[in-house]
Amino acid sequence: MTKTPDFTHATYKLVRCIGCDATVSVCRPQEGEYAQCPRCHHKLQSGSRWSLKRCSLIALSILILMPFALGYPLLSLDLLGTKIDASVWKGIWKMAVEGYSYTAFMIFICAVLMPVSFAILVIMLQISKLLKIKPRNVLLFVGYIKPWVMFDVYLVALAVTMFKVREYATLEVDVYLIAFIFTALLTTLLFIKINLDDLWHDFYPEQKPVTASDKPLELCTACDYTFLKEDQKYDHRHRAICPRCASLIETPDSIKLQRVWATLVAGIIMLFPANLLPISGVYLTGNLSQDTLMSGVMSFISMGSYFVAFVVFFASIFVPVSKILIMLYLLASVHFKWQHSIKWQMRLLHIVHFVGRWSMLDLFVLALMMSLVTRGQIINFTVGPAAFYFGAAVFLTMISTSQFDSRLIWKVYDRKQ
């Protein structure tokens, strides 16, 4: 039997929804409950959280496992009696020293820098709590880097690599793969359980919650804080800033759209060479065989690995192209004031945010493939010129979607009502 929550003695406050800009009266949810916007169904507050102490212990466990997950062999290739190891760091380093430093740096950001930084920042939050420090910048950085933590994507890349190299030699799994799997699972768990809204509330409790007011309200999108317009502060250039996180508040819609268009168009330009040029090459007994994104999918199909072919096609071709098409449609809806189904438009935007990061799968596979075989042996993997353009396209489209403000769609919807 479902227990009905008791809101008799609850304290309500007004918040502006970051999804549709509606003003909603909400109370602090209890454990297992959450408050959502009645218009766009965006989650406004959640009572499901783990304590910061528990999250910091998970983060500490991640840092302890990181050297084993990143620096030690995960896979081994037995090629004519010679054992060749593949690790995360070895793949990135080999890619960098062989002239693909920009591509290696993009992989380093997503596979090493961001996961390590994420765990360190969570520990810094716990230290700040013990020392009674206000960690404004730490909280902001945690929110910024969460979409770029891609350990789960790298885990899938390992599985794809296993299928890809088994046609060339015998593949063995090393014991350190267990450390990598646990690190990926713990990172994903920490990603889900850490609640930034509650952390902001814990470190910066509201002195005067907005309960009822005819005065205009402001919303800071950086820390999701609703406050009275008269309480906003100003920086040295007399620009309005949030009284809690000191981020800029007022950004004109035209500037927001320019940022989205600039990064999206740049991503589209990068996607053409990414699909037309070879992304990888294999030297086998002196003969070079190069693959584009699509021919790589076809090679998996010819091997009979239909599921792997589907995964690679979905992550490397379908997701980037569909993400661009969806963003073009949403931008056109804002510019030309198209009033289509608002629920459908918001669902498309949520899908774009969710699947965008999985496009890095192909680059992670390339890094692992390069670390398995070194130059001068019978078989050798190389990175093609398309790898950089593909990585740049993924980065630019992810930035584009993060810059798109869903409230612009709702403004068009509200004008038509």
List where the protein language model places each region.
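Long C-terminal interaction/binding lobes of large macromolecular proteins
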Residues: M1-Q417
